[in-house]
From Swiss-Prot:
PANTHER family assigned to the protein according to its UniProt record, in alphabetical order: 23S RRNA METHYLTRANSFERASE, RADICAL SAM CORE DOMAIN-CONTAINING PROTEIN
Designated name of the protein: Dual-specificity RNA methyltransferase RlmN
E.C. numbers: 2.1.1.192
Cofactor note: Binds 1 [4Fe-4S] cluster. The cluster is coordinated with 3 cysteines and an exchangeable S-adenosyl-L-methionine.
Binding site for S-adenosyl-L-methionine: 176-177, 208, 230-232, 307
Compartments in which it is found: Cytoplasm
Organism in which the protein naturally occurs: Burkholderia ambifaria (strain MC40-6)
C-alpha cells in the first residue's frame, strides 16, 4: 500500500527517474528497468516487476505509485477515430483523440484543462483556463491510448517495435497551449522519444503553438521536435483579433522565431495552420498576403475548415473558396493541404475539442452529453 504522499512515477522522465532511484540508494540501471516496466509493459504494480530486486520493490511499494488519469468515456467514430474523455480531477476533463490512417496512427494529446490564449475561432478558449496538466497526465494519455489500442488488436504489451506500435505519431494539439505548460510538456515529450519508453522519433512528435516566442526558442535549444504554428491570419491587425497573443508577439517576431527554430528542427519546414473563416481571412488577397508574410520561412500550409460553435459568431468558408485560396498558395509552389474532417460524429473533429463551453471543462455535463472538443490534427 502506498502512502498518501507517494510520488507518481509517471511524472519522471529518464533523468528524473534516475535521480529518484538514486535517492533510494539504487543504481541508474534500475531506473531503466523501471521505466521499461511502466512504459513498455504497462505494469501497474511493483510485485510484477520480476527483474527488480525484492528490496527495491518493497521500497517502491512504500514510497511510490503509478497513477493514471481516469477515463470518463470512450467513443469510436464510424471512420475509426477514437476519443477518450479523461477525468483530471476537481470536475475538470480533457480529451485525447486517436486518428487511424493506412500508414500511421496519430494521437492528439492535451496539455491543459482549458486554455488562456482565447483564440476567437477556438471553442476551448471560450471555456476559460482551469489548470496545467502534470507530466503524468500528459504522458498518461499516450500510455492509456497505446495499450488500449493494442488490447483491442490483441497485441500484448512489450518493447515498442515498429510492428507492434499502434500510435506512430503524437501531436501536442489537443486542449491548451503546450508552451504555456513547458515544464510538464517537455518531460512528457522526452518519454515519447525515449527508446526505453515509446521510442518515437523527433519527426513524429509535433508540438503546435499559437506563437509563444520565448518558449519556442527554449524548445529549440532543449528538445527540438517538429513544429506547427497556429497562424490563421496574414497580417497583425487581423491576427490581433483572432489570436490575441499576437499583440505580445506580432508576426515579424513570430516569423523570426520560426527561422531560428528551423536551424535545429528535425524537419526542414514549419507547418502553418490556418483556420478558414468565411469573409474573415479567406480571400485570394489574404492568400497572397500570407505568402508575403511567410516568404522567408520554409513551410507548408494546412488549411482547416472551421467547425462552428455558437459563441464564435463565425462560419466556415465555402468549399469553393477554400479551393481558390489553396490554389493561390499551390501556384506559388508551397505545399498546401486541406484538413479532412475526422470523427465529427463523436465531436472529435477539428475545432471541437473544447469541453462544455459555457462552464469550462466541467465533467458532469460532458459525460452525459456529446462533448465539444480544439483542433484534432494529423500532420
Amino acid at each position: 500500500m502506498t502512502s498518501e504522499t507517494s510520488v507518481n512515477l509517471l511524472d519522471f522522465d529518464a533523468e528524473g527517474l534516475v535521480a529518484y532511484c538514486g535517492s533510494l540508494g539504487e543504481k541508474p540501471f534500475r531506473a531503466k528497468q523501471l521505466q521499461r516496466w511502466i512504459h513498455q509493459y504497462n505494469a501497474g504494480d511493483f510485485d510484477g516487476m520480476t527483474d527488480l530486486a525484492k528490496s527495491l520493490r518493497e521500497k517502491l511499494k512504500g514510497r511510490a505509485s503509478i497513477v493514471m488519469p481516469e477515463i470518463a468515456s470512450d467513443h469510436v467514430s464510424a471512420d475509426g477515430t477514437r476519443k477518450w474523455l479523461i477525468d483530471v480531477g476537481n470536475g475538470n476533463a480533457v480529451e485525447t483523440v486517436f486518428i487511424p490512417e493506412e500508414t500511421r496512427g496519430t494521437l492528439c494529446v492535451s496539455s491543459q484543462a482549458g486554455c488562456a490564449v482565447n483564440c476567437r475561432f477556438c471553442s476551448t478558449g471560450k471555456q476559460g483556463f482551469s489548470r496545467n496538466l502534470s507530466t503524468a497526465e500528459i504522458i498518461g494519455q499516450l500510455r492509456m491510448a497505446e495499450f488500449a489500442l493494442r488490447a483491442s488488436l490483441g497485441r500484448a504489451p512489450g518493447p515498442n517495435g515498429k510492428a507492434e506500435r499502434v500510435v506512430t505519431n503524437v501531436v501536442m494539439m489537443g486542449m491548451g497551449e503546450p508552451l504555456l505548460n513547458y515544464n510538464a510538456v517537455v518531460p512528457a515529450m522526452r518519454l515519447m522519444l525515449d527508446d526505453n519508453a515509446y521510442g518515437l522519433s523527433r519527426r513524429r512528435v509535433t508540438l503546435s503553438t499559437s506563437g509563444v516566442v520565448p518558449m519556442m526558442d527554449r524548445l529549440g535549444a532543449e528538445l527540438p521536435v517538429a513544429l506547427a504554428v497556429s497562424l490563421h491570419a496574414p497580417n497583425d491587425a487581423l491576427r490581433d483579433e483572432l489570436v490575441p497573443l499576437n499583440k505580445k508577439h506580432p508576426l515579424r517576431e513570430l516569423m523570426a522565431a520560426c527561422q531560428r527554430y528551423l536551424k535545429v528542427a528535425p524537419r526542414d519546414f514549419i507547418t502553418f495552420e490556418y483556420c478558414m473563416l468565411d469573409g474573415v481571412n479567406d480571400t485570394e488577397a489574404h492568400a497572397r498576403e500570407l505568402l508575403a508574410v511567410t516568404r522567408d520561412v520554409p513551410c507548408k500550409f494546412n488549411l482547416i475548415p472551421f467547425n462552428p460553435f455558437p459563441e464564435s459568431g463565425l462560419i466556415r468558408s465555402k468549399p469553393e473558396q477554400i479551393k481558390r485560396f489553396a490554389q493561390v498558395l499551390i501556384d506559388a509552389g508551397v505545399v498546401t493541404t486541406v484538413r479532412k474532417t475526422r470523427g465529427d460524429d463523436i465531436d472529435a473533429a477539428c475545432g471541437q475539442l473544447a469541453g462544455a463551453v459555457k462552464d469550462r471543462t466541467r465533467l458532469a455535463e460532458r459525460t452525459g452529453a456529446a462533448a465539444k472538443i480544439i483542433e484534432v490534427r494529423a500532420i
